[in-house]
Protein backbone atom coordinates (compact mmCIF):
# COMPACT_ATOMS: atom_id res chain seq x y z
CA UNK A 1 0.00 0.00 0.00
CA UNK A 2 1.45 3.39 -1.03
CA UNK A 3 -0.63 5.64 1.22
CA UNK A 4 -1.50 5.35 4.89
CA UNK A 5 -4.06 7.48 6.70
CA UNK A 6 -3.62 7.76 10.47
CA UNK A 7 -5.61 9.87 12.89
CA UNK A 8 -4.01 11.51 15.92
CA UNK A 9 -6.15 12.73 18.79
CA UNK A 10 -3.97 15.27 20.61
CA UNK A 11 -5.42 16.66 23.84
CA UNK A 12 -3.75 19.49 25.68
CA UNK A 13 -4.72 21.19 28.91
CA UNK A 14 -6.35 24.06 27.00
CA UNK A 15 -7.43 22.60 23.64
CA UNK A 16 -7.74 19.41 21.65
CA UNK A 17 -7.39 18.48 18.00
CA UNK A 18 -8.22 15.58 15.75
CA UNK A 19 -5.56 15.51 13.03
CA UNK A 20 -5.37 13.41 9.87
CA UNK A 21 -1.96 12.30 8.60
CA UNK A 22 -1.30 11.07 5.07
CA UNK A 23 1.92 9.13 4.59
CA UNK A 24 3.31 8.21 1.19
CA UNK A 25 5.56 5.23 1.87
CA UNK A 26 7.10 5.34 -1.61
CA UNK A 27 8.28 8.95 -1.40
CA UNK A 28 8.37 9.13 2.43
CA UNK A 29 6.25 12.27 2.48
CA UNK A 30 4.09 13.08 5.49
CA UNK A 31 1.36 15.71 5.63
CA UNK A 32 -1.03 16.74 8.40
CA UNK A 33 -4.51 18.22 8.16
CA UNK A 34 -6.58 19.51 11.05
CA UNK A 35 -10.02 17.91 11.04
CA UNK A 36 -11.53 19.21 14.26
CA UNK A 37 -10.37 21.59 16.99
CA UNK A 38 -12.11 22.11 20.31
CA UNK A 39 -11.68 23.84 23.65
CA UNK A 40 -10.64 22.07 26.84
CA UNK A 41 -11.07 24.05 30.03
CA UNK A 42 -11.60 23.54 33.73
CA UNK A 43 -15.00 23.62 35.38
CA UNK A 44 -16.00 23.79 39.03
CA UNK A 45 -17.86 20.69 40.23
CA UNK A 46 -18.70 20.22 43.91
CA UNK A 47 -15.82 22.52 44.82
CA UNK A 48 -13.23 20.74 42.64
CA UNK A 49 -11.54 21.88 39.42
CA UNK A 50 -12.61 19.13 37.01
CA UNK A 51 -12.39 18.23 33.33
CA UNK A 52 -15.54 18.03 31.20
CA UNK A 53 -14.68 14.50 30.13
CA UNK A 54 -17.97 13.81 28.35
CA UNK A 55 -17.61 16.92 26.20
CA UNK A 56 -14.06 15.90 25.26
CA UNK A 57 -15.22 12.43 24.26
CA UNK A 58 -18.03 13.93 22.19
CA UNK A 59 -15.54 16.11 20.30
CA UNK A 60 -13.16 13.19 19.75
CA UNK A 61 -15.95 11.11 18.25
CA UNK A 62 -17.10 14.06 16.15
CA UNK A 63 -13.62 14.49 14.71
CA UNK A 64 -13.30 10.79 13.89
CA UNK A 65 -16.71 10.78 12.20
CA UNK A 66 -15.72 13.79 10.11
CA UNK A 67 -12.79 11.81 8.71
CA UNK A 68 -14.96 8.79 7.97
CA UNK A 69 -17.61 10.94 6.32
CA UNK A 70 -14.98 12.15 3.85
CA UNK A 71 -14.75 8.58 2.62
CA UNK A 72 -11.20 8.15 3.91
CA UNK A 73 -10.22 4.66 5.03
CA UNK A 74 -8.43 5.16 8.34
CA UNK A 75 -5.57 2.73 8.98
CA UNK A 76 -5.20 3.49 12.70
CA UNK A 77 -5.97 5.91 15.53
CA UNK A 78 -3.75 7.10 18.40
CA UNK A 79 -4.49 9.29 21.43
CA UNK A 80 -2.09 11.42 23.49
CA UNK A 81 -2.88 13.82 26.35
CA UNK A 82 -1.27 15.64 29.25
CA UNK A 83 -0.02 13.52 32.15
CA UNK A 84 -0.85 12.70 35.79
CA UNK A 85 -4.67 13.02 35.65
CA UNK A 86 -6.94 9.98 35.65
CA UNK A 87 -10.53 8.74 35.41
CA UNK A 88 -12.13 6.37 37.94
CA UNK A 89 -14.42 3.50 36.91
CA UNK A 90 -16.66 1.13 38.84
CA UNK A 91 -17.03 -2.65 38.40
CA UNK A 92 -19.34 -2.12 35.43
CA UNK A 93 -16.78 0.10 33.72
CA UNK A 94 -18.86 3.22 34.31
CA UNK A 95 -17.27 6.49 35.31
CA UNK A 96 -17.19 7.36 39.02
CA UNK A 97 -17.39 11.13 39.36
CA UNK A 98 -15.57 13.60 37.13
CA UNK A 99 -11.77 13.59 36.77
CA UNK A 100 -10.18 16.24 38.97
CA UNK A 101 -7.52 18.43 37.38
CA UNK A 102 -3.93 18.48 38.58
CA UNK A 103 -4.41 22.24 39.05
CA UNK A 104 -6.98 21.66 41.81
CA UNK A 105 -5.73 22.51 45.30
CA UNK A 106 -6.81 19.21 46.91
CA UNK A 107 -3.18 18.02 46.96
CA UNK A 108 -1.99 20.95 49.09
CA UNK A 109 0.15 19.56 51.89
CA UNK A 110 0.03 15.96 50.63
CA UNK A 111 3.53 15.70 49.19
CA UNK A 112 5.24 16.72 52.46
CA UNK A 113 3.45 13.79 54.14
CA UNK A 114 5.04 11.38 51.67
CA UNK A 115 8.49 12.87 52.21
CA UNK A 116 8.16 12.23 55.95
CA UNK A 117 6.40 8.86 55.85
CA UNK A 118 8.28 7.21 52.96
CA UNK A 119 11.30 9.45 52.51
CA UNK A 120 12.30 11.62 49.57
CA UNK A 121 15.31 9.55 48.56
CA UNK A 122 13.31 6.31 48.81
CA UNK A 123 10.53 7.63 46.57
CA UNK A 124 13.11 8.82 44.05
CA UNK A 125 15.07 5.57 44.20
CA UNK A 126 11.91 3.65 43.36
CA UNK A 127 10.37 5.95 40.74
CA UNK A 128 13.11 8.21 39.37
CA UNK A 129 10.43 10.87 38.92
CA UNK A 130 10.60 14.52 39.93
CA UNK A 131 8.64 15.82 42.90
CA UNK A 132 5.66 17.86 41.78
CA UNK A 133 2.79 18.45 44.22
CA UNK A 134 0.17 17.35 41.66
CA UNK A 135 1.74 14.02 40.66
CA UNK A 136 -0.77 11.17 40.57
CA UNK A 137 0.69 9.62 43.72
CA UNK A 138 -0.42 12.68 45.71
CA UNK A 139 -3.73 13.00 43.85
CA UNK A 140 -4.64 9.42 44.76
CA UNK A 141 -3.69 9.99 48.39
CA UNK A 142 -5.93 13.06 48.44
CA UNK A 143 -8.75 11.04 46.88
CA UNK A 144 -8.65 8.13 49.31
CA UNK A 145 -8.29 10.35 52.39
CA UNK A 146 -10.77 13.07 51.43
CA UNK A 147 -13.42 11.06 49.55
CA UNK A 148 -13.64 7.55 51.08
CA UNK A 149 -17.23 7.00 49.91
CA UNK A 150 -16.26 7.72 46.31
CA UNK A 151 -13.14 5.58 46.67
CA UNK A 152 -15.24 2.60 47.77
CA UNK A 153 -16.97 2.57 44.37
CA UNK A 154 -13.73 2.36 42.37
CA UNK A 155 -12.66 -0.79 40.53
CA UNK A 156 -10.34 0.72 37.89
CA UNK A 157 -8.27 3.87 37.38
CA UNK A 158 -7.32 4.85 33.83
CA UNK A 159 -5.03 7.70 32.85
CA UNK A 160 -6.62 10.19 30.48
CA UNK A 161 -5.50 8.78 27.09
CA UNK A 162 -6.21 5.23 28.24
CA UNK A 163 -9.72 6.26 29.24
CA UNK A 164 -10.52 7.64 25.79
CA UNK A 165 -9.04 4.53 24.14
CA UNK A 166 -11.24 2.45 26.43
CA UNK A 167 -14.30 4.44 25.43
CA UNK A 168 -13.55 3.81 21.75
CA UNK A 169 -12.60 0.13 22.02
CA UNK A 170 -14.02 -1.26 25.26
CA UNK A 171 -10.50 -2.46 26.15
CA UNK A 172 -8.47 -1.21 29.11
CA UNK A 173 -4.80 -0.32 28.74
CA UNK A 174 -2.18 1.42 30.85
CA UNK A 175 0.42 2.93 28.52
CA UNK A 176 3.96 3.07 29.87
CA UNK A 177 5.21 6.58 28.99
CA UNK A 178 2.21 8.23 30.60
CA UNK A 179 2.18 5.80 33.53
CA UNK A 180 5.69 6.90 34.49
CA UNK A 181 4.47 10.47 35.07
CA UNK A 182 2.39 9.23 38.02
CA UNK A 183 5.51 8.70 40.21
CA UNK A 184 4.05 5.26 40.93
CA UNK A 185 5.94 3.11 38.40
CA UNK A 186 9.08 1.35 39.64
CA UNK A 187 12.00 2.44 37.48
CA UNK A 188 13.62 -1.01 37.66
CA UNK A 189 10.59 -3.21 36.92
CA UNK A 190 8.46 -0.89 34.71
CA UNK A 191 5.49 -2.01 36.82
CA UNK A 192 3.51 -0.31 39.55
CA UNK A 193 5.51 0.01 42.75
CA UNK A 194 3.79 -1.82 45.62
CA UNK A 195 5.18 0.43 48.36
CA UNK A 196 4.29 3.71 46.67
CA UNK A 197 0.86 2.51 45.58
CA UNK A 198 0.05 1.20 49.06
CA UNK A 199 0.85 4.61 50.55
CA UNK A 200 -1.79 6.26 48.35
CA UNK A 201 -4.55 4.01 49.67
CA UNK A 202 -5.44 2.94 46.13
CA UNK A 203 -5.66 -0.75 45.29
CA UNK A 204 -3.21 -2.35 42.89
CA UNK A 205 -6.18 -4.12 41.28
CA UNK A 206 -7.24 -0.74 39.89
CA UNK A 207 -4.31 -0.93 37.47
CA UNK A 208 -2.98 -3.33 34.86
CA UNK A 209 0.70 -3.73 34.03
CA UNK A 210 1.92 -0.80 31.91
CA UNK A 211 2.40 -1.61 28.23
CA UNK A 212 4.99 -0.02 25.98
CA UNK A 213 4.01 2.04 22.93
CA UNK A 214 3.21 0.20 19.72
CA UNK A 215 0.58 -2.37 20.69
CA UNK A 216 -2.97 -2.37 19.35
CA UNK A 217 -5.44 -1.81 22.20
CA UNK A 218 -8.56 -2.75 20.27
CA UNK A 219 -10.79 -1.58 17.44
CA UNK A 220 -13.09 1.38 16.99
CA UNK A 221 -16.06 0.63 14.77
CA UNK A 222 -16.66 3.62 12.53
CA UNK A 223 -20.16 4.68 11.38
CA UNK A 224 -19.59 2.83 8.10
CA UNK A 225 -18.93 -0.39 10.02
CA UNK A 226 -15.17 -0.67 9.44
CA UNK A 227 -13.02 -1.84 12.36
CA UNK A 228 -10.13 0.58 12.88
CA UNK A 229 -7.25 -0.34 15.22
CA UNK A 230 -6.56 2.02 18.11
CA UNK A 231 -2.82 2.02 18.81
CA UNK A 232 -1.18 2.66 22.17
CA UNK A 233 1.11 5.49 21.10
CA UNK A 234 3.52 7.28 23.44
CA UNK A 235 0.43 8.70 25.06
CA UNK A 236 2.02 11.36 27.23
CA UNK A 237 2.06 14.35 24.88
CA UNK A 238 5.65 15.21 25.71
CA UNK A 239 6.76 11.65 24.99
CA UNK A 240 5.15 12.00 21.56
CA UNK A 241 6.72 15.43 21.05
CA UNK A 242 10.20 14.09 21.79
CA UNK A 243 9.72 11.30 19.24
CA UNK A 244 9.14 13.98 16.60
CA UNK A 245 12.08 16.14 17.72
CA UNK A 246 14.74 15.83 15.00
CA UNK A 247 17.60 15.54 17.48
CA UNK A 248 20.87 15.66 15.55
CA UNK A 249 23.02 13.70 18.01
CA UNK A 250 23.65 13.01 21.69
CA UNK A 251 24.68 16.64 22.19
CA UNK A 252 21.18 17.87 21.32
CA UNK A 253 18.72 18.84 24.03
CA UNK A 254 15.00 19.41 23.51
CA UNK A 255 12.45 21.87 24.80
CA UNK A 256 8.79 20.99 24.33
CA UNK A 257 7.21 24.43 24.58
CA UNK A 258 3.53 24.88 25.30
CA UNK A 259 1.38 25.36 28.38
CA UNK A 260 4.25 23.57 30.08
CA UNK A 261 7.87 23.75 29.00
CA UNK A 262 9.75 20.48 29.34
CA UNK A 263 13.49 20.61 28.83
CA UNK A 264 15.69 17.54 28.69
CA UNK A 265 17.64 15.01 26.71
CA UNK A 266 17.26 11.40 25.62
CA UNK A 267 19.20 8.70 27.42
CA UNK A 268 19.47 4.94 27.38
CA UNK A 269 19.89 5.00 31.15
CA UNK A 270 18.08 6.82 33.96
CA UNK A 271 19.80 9.34 36.22
CA UNK A 272 18.85 8.69 39.85
CA UNK A 273 21.96 9.92 41.66
CA UNK A 274 21.90 12.22 44.67
CA UNK A 275 22.79 15.05 42.28
CA UNK A 276 19.77 14.23 40.11
CA UNK A 277 17.53 14.14 43.17
CA UNK A 278 18.87 17.48 44.42
CA UNK A 279 18.16 19.01 41.00
CA UNK A 280 14.67 17.42 40.91
CA UNK A 281 15.42 15.72 37.59
CA UNK A 282 12.80 13.34 36.24
CA UNK A 283 13.33 10.12 34.27
CA UNK A 284 10.10 9.67 32.35
CA UNK A 285 9.58 6.75 30.02
CA UNK A 286 10.03 7.13 26.29
CA UNK A 287 9.68 4.99 23.20
CA UNK A 288 12.01 2.06 22.52
CA UNK A 289 13.17 1.87 26.12
CA UNK A 290 14.66 5.37 26.08
CA UNK A 291 14.39 7.73 29.03
CA UNK A 292 13.33 11.33 28.83
CA UNK A 293 15.64 12.95 31.37
CA UNK A 294 14.06 16.34 31.91
CA UNK A 295 12.67 19.07 34.13
CA UNK A 296 9.21 20.63 34.14
CA UNK A 297 8.93 24.39 33.74
CA UNK A 298 5.66 26.27 34.17
CA UNK A 299 5.95 27.51 30.56
CA UNK A 300 3.50 29.59 28.58
CA UNK A 301 0.73 28.92 31.11
CA UNK A 302 1.62 32.27 32.68
CA UNK A 303 1.16 34.07 29.37
CA UNK A 304 -2.03 32.15 28.55
CA UNK A 305 -3.56 33.26 31.83
CA UNK A 306 -2.57 36.89 31.27
CA UNK A 307 -4.02 36.81 27.75
CA UNK A 308 -7.28 35.41 29.09
CA UNK A 309 -7.54 37.81 32.02
CA UNK A 310 -6.67 40.85 29.91
CA UNK A 311 -8.80 39.66 26.97
CA UNK A 312 -5.90 39.97 24.56
CA UNK A 313 -6.59 38.38 21.19
CA UNK A 314 -3.77 39.73 18.99
CA UNK A 315 -0.67 37.94 20.26
CA UNK A 316 1.66 39.05 17.39
CA UNK A 317 0.95 42.71 18.22
CA UNK A 318 1.67 42.08 21.90
CA UNK A 319 4.94 40.31 21.07
CA UNK A 320 6.01 43.23 18.84
CA UNK A 321 5.31 45.67 21.68
CA UNK A 322 7.19 43.41 24.08
CA UNK A 323 10.25 43.19 21.85
CA UNK A 324 10.59 46.99 21.92
CA UNK A 325 10.98 47.02 25.71
CA UNK A 326 14.33 46.75 27.52
CA UNK A 327 15.23 43.27 28.77
CA UNK A 328 15.39 41.95 32.32
CA UNK A 329 13.73 44.83 34.19
CA UNK A 330 11.24 42.43 35.78
CA UNK A 331 12.25 38.88 36.67
CA UNK A 332 10.34 36.13 38.44
CA UNK A 333 10.80 32.43 39.00
CA UNK A 334 8.23 30.86 36.64
CA UNK A 335 8.45 27.65 38.67
CA UNK A 336 7.28 29.27 41.88
CA UNK A 337 4.20 27.27 42.87
CA UNK A 338 2.28 30.50 43.41
CA UNK A 339 1.79 30.53 39.62
CA UNK A 340 0.16 27.07 39.33
CA UNK A 341 -3.39 28.44 39.38
CA UNK A 342 -3.72 31.87 41.03
CA UNK A 343 -6.99 33.77 41.02
CA UNK A 344 -5.29 36.65 39.19
CA UNK A 345 -2.06 35.89 37.30
CA UNK A 346 -1.28 39.55 36.59
CA UNK A 347 -1.57 40.44 40.26
CA UNK A 348 0.50 37.41 41.26
CA UNK A 349 3.35 38.35 38.91
CA UNK A 350 3.25 41.94 40.15
CA UNK A 351 3.34 40.77 43.77
CA UNK A 352 6.35 38.53 43.08
CA UNK A 353 8.25 41.49 41.61
CA UNK A 354 7.23 43.77 44.44
CA UNK A 355 8.33 41.25 47.08
CA UNK A 356 11.81 41.07 45.56
CA UNK A 357 12.24 44.87 45.38
CA UNK A 358 12.02 45.09 41.61
CA UNK A 359 10.07 47.43 39.35
CA UNK A 360 6.50 46.22 38.91
CA UNK A 361 5.23 45.43 35.40
CA UNK A 362 2.01 47.32 34.67
CA UNK A 363 1.26 47.21 30.95
CA UNK A 364 0.42 44.03 29.07
CA UNK A 365 3.70 44.27 27.17
CA UNK A 366 5.65 44.62 30.42
CA UNK A 367 3.95 41.53 31.82
CA UNK A 368 4.81 39.58 28.66
CA UNK A 369 8.40 40.85 28.79
CA UNK A 370 8.66 39.67 32.39
CA UNK A 371 7.39 36.22 31.42
CA UNK A 372 9.61 35.82 28.34
CA UNK A 373 12.82 37.04 30.02
CA UNK A 374 12.19 34.93 33.10
CA UNK A 375 11.48 31.80 31.06
CA UNK A 376 14.60 32.25 28.92
CA UNK A 377 16.81 32.68 31.98
CA UNK A 378 15.25 29.66 33.66
CA UNK A 379 15.82 27.64 30.47
CA UNK A 380 19.50 28.58 30.62
CA UNK A 381 19.74 27.64 34.28
CA UNK A 382 18.14 24.24 33.72
CA UNK A 383 20.15 23.49 30.56
CA UNK A 384 23.30 24.10 32.59
CA UNK A 385 21.96 21.81 35.33
CA UNK A 386 21.25 19.03 32.81
CA UNK A 387 24.70 19.39 31.22
CA UNK A 388 26.36 19.09 34.62
CA UNK A 389 24.29 16.00 35.39
CA UNK A 390 25.45 14.10 32.32
CA UNK A 391 28.97 15.55 32.31
CA UNK A 392 28.79 16.96 28.77
CA UNK A 393 27.71 20.29 27.37
CA UNK A 394 24.96 20.59 24.78
CA UNK A 395 25.68 22.15 21.41
CA UNK A 396 22.12 22.51 20.14
CA UNK A 397 18.61 22.93 21.52
CA UNK A 398 15.50 21.83 19.61
CA UNK A 399 12.33 23.72 20.51
CA UNK A 400 9.14 21.96 19.43
CA UNK A 401 5.44 22.48 20.03
CA UNK A 402 3.21 25.53 19.82
CA UNK A 403 5.66 27.73 21.72
CA UNK A 404 8.28 27.36 18.99
CA UNK A 405 6.27 29.86 16.91
CA UNK A 406 7.30 32.64 19.32
CA UNK A 407 10.38 34.04 17.56
CA UNK A 408 11.14 36.50 20.36
CA UNK A 409 11.19 33.80 23.04
CA UNK A 410 13.25 31.51 20.78
CA UNK A 411 15.90 34.20 20.30
CA UNK A 412 15.93 35.06 24.00
CA UNK A 413 16.40 31.36 24.71
CA UNK A 414 19.32 31.12 22.28
CA UNK A 415 20.93 34.22 23.78
CA UNK A 416 20.50 33.06 27.37
CA UNK A 417 21.55 29.45 26.75
CA UNK A 418 24.45 30.45 24.52
CA UNK A 419 23.82 27.72 21.95
CA UNK A 420 22.12 27.38 18.58
CA UNK A 421 18.37 26.87 18.74
CA UNK A 422 16.41 24.96 16.10
CA UNK A 423 12.66 25.68 16.22
CA UNK A 424 10.10 23.22 14.83
CA UNK A 425 8.05 21.29 14.17
CA UNK A 426 5.04 23.01 15.72
CA UNK A 427 2.84 19.91 15.69
CA UNK A 428 5.40 17.73 17.47
CA UNK A 429 2.99 15.85 19.75
CA UNK A 430 0.70 15.02 16.84
CA UNK A 431 3.63 13.93 14.67
CA UNK A 432 5.10 11.71 17.38
CA UNK A 433 1.68 10.14 17.85
CA UNK A 434 1.56 9.43 14.09
CA UNK A 435 5.13 8.12 14.13
CA UNK A 436 4.32 5.29 16.55
CA UNK A 437 1.25 4.41 14.48
CA UNK A 438 3.35 4.16 11.31
CA UNK A 439 5.86 1.92 13.12
CA UNK A 440 3.01 -0.28 14.34
CA UNK A 441 1.78 -0.50 10.74
CA UNK A 442 5.32 -1.59 9.70
CA UNK A 443 5.80 1.50 7.55
CA UNK A 444 8.82 2.72 9.53
CA UNK A 445 11.61 0.89 11.33
CA UNK A 446 12.12 2.92 14.49
CA UNK A 447 12.18 6.38 16.06
CA UNK A 448 15.39 7.40 14.30
CA UNK A 449 13.86 6.42 10.96
CA UNK A 450 10.81 8.53 11.74
CA UNK A 451 12.95 11.53 12.69
CA UNK A 452 14.49 11.40 9.23
CA UNK A 453 10.97 11.64 7.79
CA UNK A 454 10.23 14.64 10.03
CA UNK A 455 13.46 16.39 9.02
CA UNK A 456 12.72 15.83 5.33
CA UNK A 457 9.15 17.13 5.54
CA UNK A 458 9.23 20.01 8.02
CA UNK A 459 11.36 23.15 7.86
CA UNK A 460 13.20 24.29 10.97
CA UNK A 461 14.11 27.87 11.89
CA UNK A 462 17.60 28.52 13.26
CA UNK A 463 18.40 31.05 15.98
CA UNK A 464 22.04 31.98 16.58
CA UNK A 465 22.98 33.19 20.09
CA UNK A 466 24.12 36.77 20.61
CA UNK A 467 26.65 36.76 23.48
CA UNK A 468 26.44 40.57 23.73
CA UNK A 469 22.69 40.65 24.32
CA UNK A 470 21.28 42.10 27.52
CA UNK A 471 19.78 38.79 28.60
CA UNK A 472 23.10 36.98 28.09
CA UNK A 473 24.67 39.38 30.57
CA UNK A 474 21.98 38.57 33.14
CA UNK A 475 22.45 34.79 33.10
CA UNK A 476 25.03 34.73 35.88
CA UNK A 477 22.92 37.04 38.06
CA UNK A 478 19.64 35.18 37.70
CA UNK A 479 18.60 33.35 40.84
CA UNK A 480 15.62 31.18 39.89
CA UNK A 481 15.04 29.93 43.43
CA UNK A 482 14.80 33.29 45.11
CA UNK A 483 11.02 33.01 45.45
CA UNK A 484 9.94 31.02 48.44
CA UNK A 485 8.15 27.92 47.17
CA UNK A 486 9.38 25.99 44.13
CA UNK A 487 7.08 23.45 42.48
CA UNK A 488 9.07 20.69 44.16
CA UNK A 489 9.21 22.30 47.60
UniProtKB/Swiss-Prot annotation:
The enzyme's E.C. designation: 2.7.1.5
Keywords for this protein: ATP-binding, Disulfide bond, Kinase, Magnesium, Nucleotide-binding, Rhamnose metabolism, Transferase
Pathway named in the protein's UniProt entry: Carbohydrate degradation; L-rhamnose degradation; glycerone phosphate from L-rhamnose: step 2/3
Family annotation (InterPro entries): ATPase_NBD (IPR043129), FGGY_C (IPR018485), FGGY_N (IPR018484), Rhamnulokinase (IPR013449)
Regions annotated as coiled coil: none
Residue sites binding substrate per the record: 83, 236-238, 296
Pfam entry (one): FGGY_C
Catalytic activity: L-rhamnulose + ATP = L-rhamnulose 1-phosphate + ADP + H(+)
Gene Ontology CC entries for this record: cytosol
SUPFAM superfamilies: Actin-like ATPase domain
PANTHER family per the UniProt record, alphabetical: L-RHAMNULOKINASE, SUGAR KINASE
Family recorded in the similarity comment: Belongs to the rhamnulokinase family.
NCBIfam families tied to this protein: PRK10640.1, rhamnulo_kin
Entry protein name: Rhamnulokinase
Taxonomic lineage from the root: Bacteria, Pseudomonadati, Pseudomonadota, Gammaproteobacteria, Enterobacterales
Protein encoded by which gene: rhaB
Amino acid sequence: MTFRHCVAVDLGASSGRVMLARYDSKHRTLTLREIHRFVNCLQKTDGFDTWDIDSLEKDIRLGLKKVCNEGILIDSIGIDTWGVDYVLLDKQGQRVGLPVSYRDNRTTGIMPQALVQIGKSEIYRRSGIQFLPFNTIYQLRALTKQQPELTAQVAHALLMPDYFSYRLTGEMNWEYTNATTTQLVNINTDDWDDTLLAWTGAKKSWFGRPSHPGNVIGDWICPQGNRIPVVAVASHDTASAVIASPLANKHSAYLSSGTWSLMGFESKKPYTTDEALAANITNEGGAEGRYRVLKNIMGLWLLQRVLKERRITDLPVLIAQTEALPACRFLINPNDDRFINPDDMRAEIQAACRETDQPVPVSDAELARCIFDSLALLYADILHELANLRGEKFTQLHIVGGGCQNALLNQLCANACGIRVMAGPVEASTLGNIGIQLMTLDELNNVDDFRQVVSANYDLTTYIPNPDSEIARHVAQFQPKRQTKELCA
